[in-house]
Amino acid sequence: MVLYFTGTGNSRYLARRIAEGLEMPLYDLNACIKAGDTAPVQTGRDVVLVTPTYAWRIPRVVSEWLGKTALTGAERIWFVMDCGSEIGNAAGYNRQLAAQKHLRYMGTAQIIMPENYIAMFNAPQKEQARSIVKQAEPTLQKVLAQLRAGQEFSPPRDNLYDRFMSGSVNPVFYRFFVKADAFRATDACIGCGRCVELCPLNNVHLKNGKPVWGKNCTHCMACICYCPKEAIEYGEKSKGKPRYHFEALEKQQDI
């Protein structure tokens, strides 16, 4: 089974491609996490977990969900992580997570995809994003070939910098930067509720027709990037930046 969590569609796209290539079922963790559903999941022997990279590890909401949820029948697990640049030493923590679940760790693969973290970085324009997705294709094909063969992924880079970012920086980043306080709706907001619908942690609700954010945010960027009117800002940091979500690339041409 292919499990995935996504913020703005990159991981959903990769998970869909992997599930199709392996003829395996696809399981949406966003829906489970949003519903608070931790009922056992009948996965079968092999599990592929596809996620974005948050602070140089898999998203904390995903590791927490996995800690509460039994993967019935699972024996082996592969991790596929997409990122804008690097995953640090995420593999080391994925190995620990696999051990906690009593699963054979089959490795972690990194796939570079378009950046979406506009709370800190710039997202690409559509044509640049399409180029990045096309450049990711050989890596995706290699991942698929290894999965079909039941092979372990090759070990990713692991140096002192990677260990520092995934180790010391990760908890500091969550504590001081992963907050919803800076999100706000502009006058362009039409109160459609798309942000409420997409938030995997139910952290957004409408008040007097406008979104209001709570304290339980994972910085997935779904609310700000999927807003149809681009009516959400993250303080001053997001102003003037392109909003990125994968589905916008699919509207005009096939990927």
At which residue positions do the language-model features occur?
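FMN-binding flavodoxin-like domain, especially the glycine-rich phosphate-binding loop
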Residues: 1-2, 6-14, 20-32, 37, ...
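Generic structural "secondary-structure junction" signal
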Residues: 56, 113, 208, 234, ...
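A mid-sequence, solvent-exposed acidic-amphipathic segment
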Residues: 159-192, 197
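Short low-complexity, flexible loop/linker segments enriched in glycine and/or proline
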Residues: 41-42, 121-123, 220-222, 248-252
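Iron-sulfur cluster-binding cysteine motifs and their immediate structural context
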Residues: 184-185, 190-212, 216-218, 222-239
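Long, positively charged, glycine-interspersed low-complexity recognition regions
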Residues: 230-255
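Generic structural signal for beta-strand residues in well-ordered domains
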Residues: 40-41, 70, 176, 197, ...
